[in-house]
Amino acid sequence: MVRLLRYGTIFGPLKDRWRYLYKRDLYKRRLEAGPEPERFRSALINWNYDAELYACTHRFGEKLNIESLRNAMTDASFLKQIVKQRTEAGLAATDQTTLAFTHNQELAKQGKQIAEDFLQKALHYWYPKFPQEGIEAITKFLLSESTIADISSGLGFKTLIRCDIPSPRPTMLTNALFAFIGSINENTGRSRAEVFVADFILTHLVGKDINEIWQVKNPMGLLTKVLEENGRQAPESRLIWATGVSSVLSTYVVGVYSNKEFLGKSAGATVSIAEEMAARDALRRLFETDEKRAQIPFDKLYKKGLLLDK
Amino acid sequence: MAFNKAQQLATFSRVWYLFDAKWQCPHMSGERIARILRGEHKPIYYPGESTGDCVIAINTRHVALRNDAWRSEALHIKREYAKTRYDIPLFKLHELDPTKVLHLCVLSCMPSDSIRRYDMARLYTFPDDAVPVHLIKNVCDQIRGSRVIPKRLDDLTPNDTKTFPQMFKWPKELVLDDLDRDKFVRVVPPEEIPKREVMLGQRAGKQNYWFHVPTSRHEEVKIN
Amino acid sequence: MSQFLRRITSLPIQSIRSFHSFDEVTPAKYISTRLKNGVGSRYVCQLQRLTIQVCKEFRTSFGTRDWIANDLIKFAREHPYVVVYVQPRRHRAPNLVGEYLAGDRQWIPLSNCDREKVNWWIHSLLTQKGDPQWRLLKQMHTDSPSVQGIWTPFTNKPIDRITRTYPDKDLTEMEYPQITATQQIQELFEQQKLNKTS
């Protein structure tokens, strides 16, 4: 670490003129040099990649082959870089194919497919009345690059990935996580891979409202459609409460009814907002995804029959 | 607007209450109103949070104080300089500002912290039942009074007095004329009333009001 | 300057929390675990690698040396998910550097610590999430405060209140007033009447 405190300020005045000038010059030079360049973690002295991989397999309790894990953590850019280096060193094109490892693109594709299938299955099981469109939206959110990259960096893949830049890009992180799932599938079977998805990707839904993840543009229209499909009458909205009408903090509570049967109610600052929110509330109650609904039992998915063998 | 925002709005919305102060004791109703203004009637109440509701109090001109309080209780005013404190008896204060008594009663029921002024700003007081339309529109609930509104004798119809059960019969010896009060009482002319010395702005106490309060206008007359 | 002095003088030498002054506004958040650790069927130890910097000669690292000689192998066997690096450095103070899955780093000076204290610090790092720099807004937090529906001012309020025009005469008086003497007499009188007729 470089000390960027101005000498001669907090420790009192510097008495020697020459020392002051010397320190000031060092300070200026440090500023001119700019920030330190980012370095690979592997550039530091305390780094043993094999040990790291070994620890990684034990961290998640998976019995993985170290070589397969090494492949899963190798990004395409790393391979490209090695090939480029070899070409520059003057090696023949035939030698380039004899590399001992491959990149993780295939594994990632495989892992992503497993994750997508499992998430759809689990969500369908736990929210049977939620429409297919919504489940697809949630799956898309869970498998989006930002989510998966966040999970991947949280699982410590940031330093394990072999790529051409010190801090890997979100796509690299995403590929690494999916490839890890893929390699679990290859080593110990699909069920184990699905448990991994349930433990680390599906749990991303904790504390999130799945009705907010699926953004419905016109909730009243959707409610009408759903009621029609169920053979019920069209929804009617009624004002239940209104207070502070002429004040800034006005509150309206609007309820939605179908054939005098209560569907849902909600509050809002204006009547139109309250009506829209009431329609959303009615949808939540119809789909059985409101707050009364229990969370997905992430640790008991075996008992629910979603995962057959442990 | 997200759905949890709507829930938040519903939980923390300020409800407007109406309070009819006619024939109510301002001290007891002040306790109730202060509780509502501070939000203590809500389960979400927490001392640091502003969770109070709004209250419109009407008919404050017609509040009923206990016992002799209109005359015997006063607003003590202490100003900065020496010998400048004086009292305003409540009936005089009520003449000056008919909403002031209820206002002060509510104020005295609140703890004297810095939030008190903001809570009091949510109290709207009106001397009669004339309330601006834009305020009465907001109301969605009413606070019940703490006193039974009494029925005055001149409110009763002659039919009521007739049908009321006769509890007992007057004895024959009793002369009903003797019940007439005016026979035993003489109205004292003002020149006969003993004058008191009034000290201006000296001491708090009902003897030292800043104007003269004549109290004894009647005198008992002995009939032999 | 005074703050700086206070930091030096009053705080113990070994403290994992950094100095916090209430005059400054520091970042704060609700209590949480990284990636909802432990919600699924497994717990992931957040400590990724542990570097022990130690001197072979100086007295300051006697406890650290003891720990390495006696407990290191056992520790590594029990916790295979932590990569332990031992870094001998000549004539310098012993340090403990923990690196976490999320990329956080913890540095703890181990000067003059005995074996037990070193063990304590290592297990302290092992059981951590890794970011003590955050101030916690509250010690507890929940994302779903209620499953019965959150309370609003309108719950349990009689529904007829919205249909009335205010001021309303029915709501002015007390709900359950005491019976006055007049009313009592009238009631007694009516009872007497009934008794006489029956």
Describe the predicted segments one by one.
Chain A
Residues 1-310:
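Double-stranded RNA-binding/processing signature
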